[in-house]
C-alpha cells in the first residue's frame, strides 16, 4: 500500500478502497469466465467470499445479509468490534453482494485528523427517581430519553478500560464515544438506571464511597454491585467518607490531614478490592476537588484514572489523573446534547 494512501484519514482511505472495488470484482468475474473455457486445466478458483486481502484490510463480499457484528466476530475477534467495520463503511447497506472493507490494523489511535482531534465526554449522574426535587436527581423518564438519544444517534458507551487504553495510546475507540459515570452509590442506580442502561446495551462506571454502601435504604449494597460488575459495569472509588481531599478540617494538623487523605484514597481501594475481588484502578475526587498532592497520592495508591467535575471532554493527551466530567444536572435535551462533544475542530494542516 502506498505511504500517501496510508496517511489519509480512515474515511478517505475507505472511500478510495470502495472506488477500486468495481475493478476488483471485474477481475474476479473475468478470471472465472476465462478459466471456465479451459476445462482440461485444474484451477483453484478465488474465494467467492473474499475479494481482496492484505495485512491492513480485507475487502469482503457479503454472502448473505450478514451483520457488522457477525463480520467483527469472524475477522476481528469479537462482536464488540463491529463499530470498526461500521465506521469503515459509511453509507454502505449490508446486504448480499455488497463489498465491505474490514480494517485489520488499529490505526489513528489518537483520533487525529487534519480538521482536529477526538474528545471523549464523561457524563456524570448521582441518583434517580420517578419524580425529583434536586438537581442531583435525574427523573427516570428523562434518563431514558437521554439513553435513547445516544443509541439512536450512534453513540457508544465505552468502558473505563477502553478510555484508559485510548489515553495510553494503546487502542482506538469509536468516533462517537462517551463514558457514563454515576457517583456516590445510591440504590436508585441499581433499581432505575441499571435496567435502562441494559435496555440500550450500555454499561457505566460507578464511583462509590465505601462507608455509604449498605448503610441505609437509599444506598446500594455490595451484592448489587457484584451483580452489576458481572454485567460489565466498572466499580471505582469515591473515597471512604466523601471528604474534601484538598483542605484541612477545622482543628486538623498537617500530619492528621495527610493521614486522612491517604486513608480515603488507599483505604477505599483496599475495601473495594476485597469486597469485589478486583484491582480498583479508577477514582473520582470527592466534590471533584483535587490538587497536586492528592494527584500524587492517587498515583502512588495505584490508580490509573482519576476524575474531577471540571466541564469538558478528554483528548488522548489529557492528564489521566485529572480528567474532566460533565455533571448532567439540567433536564432539557438541548443541554444534554450540548454535552456530547466528541470532536474538537482545530486545523492541523
Task: Identify the meaning behind each predicted range.
Residues 202-222:
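A short, conserved beta-to-alpha structural element at the edge of catalytic cores
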Residues 65-71:
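Extracytoplasmic Gram-positive cell-surface binding/anchoring modules and repeats
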Residues 40-55, 70, 77-115:
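Extracellular LysM carbohydrate-binding repeats and other cell-envelope/extracellular binding modules
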Residues 23-33:
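Bacterial N-terminal signal peptides
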Residues 1-17:
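N-terminal secretory signal peptides that target proteins for export/translocation
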Residues 107-181, 186-190, 242-349:
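C-terminal active-site subregion of NodB/CE4 polysaccharide deacetylases
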Residues 116, 194-201, 220-237:
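Acidic (Asp/Glu)-rich catalytic clusters
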Amino acid at each position: 500500500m502506498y505511504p500517501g494512501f496510508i496517511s489519509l484519514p480512515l474515511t478517505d482511505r475507505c472511500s478510495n478502497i470502495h472506488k477500486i472495488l468495481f475493478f476488483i470484482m471485474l477481475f474476479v468475474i473475468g478470471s472465472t469466465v476465462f478459466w471456465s473455457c479451459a476445462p482440461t486445466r485444474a484451477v483453484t478458483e478465488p474465494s467467492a467470499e473474499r475479494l481482496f486481502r492484505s495485512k491492513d484490510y480485507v475487502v469482503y463480499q457479503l454472502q448473505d445479509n450478514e451483520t457488522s457484528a457477525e463480520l467483527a466476530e469472524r475477522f476481528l475477534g469479537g462482536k464488540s468490534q463491529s463499530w470498526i467495520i461500521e465506521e469503515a463503511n459509511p453509507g454502505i447497506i449490508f446486504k448480499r453482494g455488497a463489498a465491505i472493507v474490514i480494517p485489520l490494523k488499529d490505526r489513528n489511535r489518537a483520533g487525529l485528523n487534519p480538521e482536529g482531534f477526538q474528545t471523549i465526554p464523561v457524563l456524570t449522574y448521582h441518583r434517580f427517581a420517578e419524580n425529583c426535587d434536586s438537581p442531583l436527581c435525574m427523573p427516570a423518564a428523562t434518563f431514558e430519553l437521554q439513553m435513547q438519544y445516544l443509541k439512536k444517534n450512534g453513540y457508544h458507551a465505552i468502558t473505563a478500560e477502553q478510555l484508559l487504553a485510548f489515553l495510553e495510546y494503546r487502542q482506538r475507540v469509536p468516533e462517537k464515544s462517551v463514558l457514563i459515570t454515576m457517583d456516590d452509590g445510591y440504590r436508585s442506580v441499581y433499581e432505575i438506571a441499571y435496567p435502562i442502561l441494559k435496555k440500550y446495551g450500555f454499561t457505566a462506571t460507578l464511583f462509590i464511597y465505601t462507608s455509604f454502601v449498605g448503610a441505609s435504604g437509599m444506598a446500594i449494597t455490595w451484592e448489587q454491585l457484584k451483580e452489576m460488575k458481572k454485567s460489565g459495569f466498572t466499580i471505582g472509588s469515591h473515597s471512604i467518607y466523601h471528604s474534601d481531599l484538598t483542605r484541612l478540617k477545622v482543628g486538623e494538623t498537617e500530619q492528621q490531614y495527610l493521614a486522612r487523605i491517604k486513608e480515603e484514597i488507599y483505604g477505599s481501594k483496599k475495601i473495594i478490592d476485597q469486597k469485589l475481588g478486583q484491582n480498583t484502578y479508577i477514582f473520582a475526587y470527592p466534590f471533584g476537588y483535587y490538587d497536586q498532592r492528592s494527584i500524587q497520592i492517587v498515583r502512588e495508591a495505584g490508580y490509573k484514572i482519576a476524575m474531577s467535575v471540571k466541564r469538558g471532554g478528554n483528548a488522548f493527551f489529557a492528564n489521566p489523573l485529572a480528567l474532566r466530567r460533565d455533571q448532567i444536572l439540567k433536564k432539557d435535551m438541548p443541554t444534554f446534547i450540548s454535552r456530547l462533544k466528541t470532536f474538537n475542530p482545530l486545523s492541523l494542516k
